[in-house]
């Protein structure tokens, strides 16, 4: 029986780090076709196309320099050609671009294809919250799982030990995805609470922006610990309000929950850029260009989406930390006001 074909939709630092793992496993495991396609948004790097550089030198020199990709990972600039034959689609692009990508590949996929989203963020739907996996699943008519965890891309690429969480309602599919993605240094726990896993992944970036604000104005680890605790409480409250399925406290103790929150608040790009925002006064857009090679930051965008959702539901006052991040990012509120939000949080009244 032919092995299942895999396509990675996206090629930033996280997409490339996952390609390193998936390419290695697909080359060794009989249940997968060894050729893995990776859709790459074509860019010109020093007069050469990025796809040509990746396919010639097995390295994404722009987004994951210094790390060799397996030779069986093939960069493809056309997303339809990359995805057309895939049995398993791994989505790992900034969440604001997923609708356009789904429009392009809709109608070109295998009938029995399945997907897994590594995308962190939420959308606003007609009834409020719309998870990215739901957007993809409804657009493409395929079953969707999610992967979220304490996984800084550079450390995963360096093969430093970490854990992650797959949320998958179908047990057999969950085990297949685990086989595709697990290594001795990338250990996976599978749970059926898909929505909770995904909400954890989306909201932690927003909390990390708040942690970065604290760093930028010179507050210490005690303050950051308060941000993490209050942020986790708001994450749990949000999940209980908006998740259609069960929300168990145990899921927040998996890698997708408190572990991802901690690592992102200390080491992630959202924290780093938010710190620079607080220190320099430069715009988020300018800092994305300077610090992220133009890659998009998820935390501020998630704050904007949440503000719209919560305002529509009349629940803005229920999530003061989330909304304080929004006000600093989008309404020009001074960063110091974020500290006043912590001081006056309902938890302390």
Swiss-Prot record:
Homodimer. NAD(+) binds at residues 10-15, 120, 153, 269, 296, 298. The keyword Cytoplasm applies. The modification N6-succinyllysine is found at residue 289. Keywords: Cytoplasm, NAD, Oxidoreductase, Phosphoprotein. It comes from Oryctolagus cuniculus. GO terms for biological process: carbohydrate metabolic process; glycerol-3-phosphate catabolic process. Has glycerol-3-phosphate dehydrogenase activity. This is Glycerol-3-phosphate dehydrogenase [NAD(+)], cytoplasmic. It comes from the Eukaryota. The modification Phosphotyrosine is found at residue 326. GO terms for cellular component: cytosol. Its main location: cytoplasm. It is an enzyme of class 1 (oxidoreductase).
């Amino acid at each position: 029986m032919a092995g299942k074909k895999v396509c990675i939709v996206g090629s930033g630092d996280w997409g490339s780090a996952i390609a390193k793992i998936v390419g290695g496993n697909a080359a060794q495991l009989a249940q997968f076709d060894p050729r893995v396609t990776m859709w790459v948004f074509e860019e010109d790097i020093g007069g050469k196309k990025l796809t040509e550089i990746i396919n010639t030198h097995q390295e994404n020199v722009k987004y994951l320099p210094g790390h060799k990709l397996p030779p069986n990972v093939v960069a493809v600039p056309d997303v339809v050609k990359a995805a057309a034959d895939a049995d398993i689609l791994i989505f790992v692009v900034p969440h604001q671009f997923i609708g356009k990508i789904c429009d392009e590949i809709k109608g070109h996929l295998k009938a029995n294809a399945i997907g897994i989203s590594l995308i962190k963020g939420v959308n606003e739907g007609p009834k409020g919250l719309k998870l990215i996996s739901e957007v993809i699943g409804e657009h493409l008519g395929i079953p969707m799982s999610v992967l979220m965890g304490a996984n800084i891309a550079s450390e995963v690429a360096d093969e430093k030990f970490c854990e992650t969480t797959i949320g998958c309602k179908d047990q057999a599919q969950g085990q297949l995805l685990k086989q595709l993605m697990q290594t001795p240094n990338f250990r996976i726990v599978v749970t059926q609470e898909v929505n909770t896993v995904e909400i954890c992944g989306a909201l932690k970036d927003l909390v990390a922006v708040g942690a970065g604000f604290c760093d930028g104005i010179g507050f210490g680890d005690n303050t950051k610990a308060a941000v993490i605790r209050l942020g986790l409480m708001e994450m749990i409250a949000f999940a209980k309000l908006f998740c259609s399925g069960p929300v168990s406290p145990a899921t927040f103790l998996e890698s997708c929950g408190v572990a991802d929150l901690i690592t992102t608040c200390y080491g992630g790009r959202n924290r780093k850029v938010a710190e620079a925002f607080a220190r320099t006064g430069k715009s988020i857009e300018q800092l994305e260009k300077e610090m992220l090679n133009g890659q998009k930051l998820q935390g501020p965008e998630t704050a904007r989406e949440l503000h719209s959702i919560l305002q529509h539901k009349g629940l803005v006052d229920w999530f003061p930390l989330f909304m304080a991040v929004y006000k600093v990012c989008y309404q020009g509120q001074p960063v110091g006001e974020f500290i006043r939000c912590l001081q006056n949080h309902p938890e302390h009244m």
